[in-house]
Design a protein with these regions (language model features):
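Flexible loop/turn connectors
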Residues: 31, 105-207
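Conserved small/polar residues in nucleotide/adenosyl-binding loops
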Residues: 205-215
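Short acidic/polar active-site loop segments enriched in Thr and Asp
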Residues: 52-53, 115
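Alpha-helical recognition/docking segments in bacterial nutrient-uptake
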Residues: 1-44, 48, 107-108, 112
Length: 216
């Protein structure tokens, strides 16, 4: 959702809890993933593993959660003394098919590449990965990628994708509990709740099964 989409919420008098979306209206509660922290941790992991400047597979479509992940990426660079201007950034559509087409076009233009990337979501990561593989790059031997969201597709691609896990059940449970609390309470105060995301690495068993794979 974008800012204009929220306007119809402004004058509603019923309890409102948004899930994984931020809105600054005083009558709206939000339960969100800590996107900034998840992206920060993923980027720091890439920096420490690859001892270099990670690239960024950034969504070409503006979404608030992606902008928070963008801030986490650049904050990790600054924290580790790396210049933001030297990171390779590719703007890709936030779908597997769109990211694949966009990345393939960039590769055909001989666009400079990084040795590792953080991606705004798993769809972008997987689409880019397929484009790299189409052009003969080995994943992760030549290029490593960490996605975000831990979508089911991340474990079915070869090689499997390391990603940031979003605890969807906990997210929904927290939102439902907050909504019930608002309904039953006599007084109201707006809250914005953030839930931590965690890193999910490719398992050792999977590494043994696929010789091209190495742990990020």
């Amino acid at each position: 959702m974008q800012k204009p989409d929220f306007m119809y919420l402004k004058n509603l008098t019923v309890p409102i809890v948004l899930l994984d979306t931020y809105c600054d209206f005083p009558n709206v509660d939000c339960v969100m993933i800590n996107n900034m922290q998840g992206a920060f941790n993923a980027t720091v992991r890439l920096i420490h593993k690859h001892i270099g400047q990670p690239g960024y597979l950034h969504s070409s479509y503006p979404i608030h959660s992606f902008e928070e992940r963008c801030e986490g990426f650049y904050r990790a660079l600054r924290k580790n003394g790396l210049p933001s201007s030297k990171s390779v950034v590719h703007l890709l559509s936030p779908s597997v098919e769109g990211a694949y087409a966009d990345m393939l076009e960039l590769l055909e233009q001989n666009t400079p590449l990084a040795s590792c990337y953080f991606a705004d979501n798993d769809n972008i990561a997987i689409g880019a990965m397929k484009a790299f593989q189409h052009k003969g790059y080995k994943i992760p031997a030549d290029i490593s990628i960490i996605g975000f969201d831990n979508m089911p597709l991340s474990t079915s691609v070869i090689p499997a994708l390391s990603t940031i896990h979003v605890p969807k059940q906990n997210l929904g449970k927290t939102a439902a509990e907050r909504l019930i609390n608002v309904i039953e309470s006599d007084e109201y105060y707006s809250v914005k709740i953030e839930i931590s995301a965690t890193y999910i690495a490719v398992s050792y068993t999977h590494l043994r099964a696929h010789e091209t794979l190495r742990h990020l």
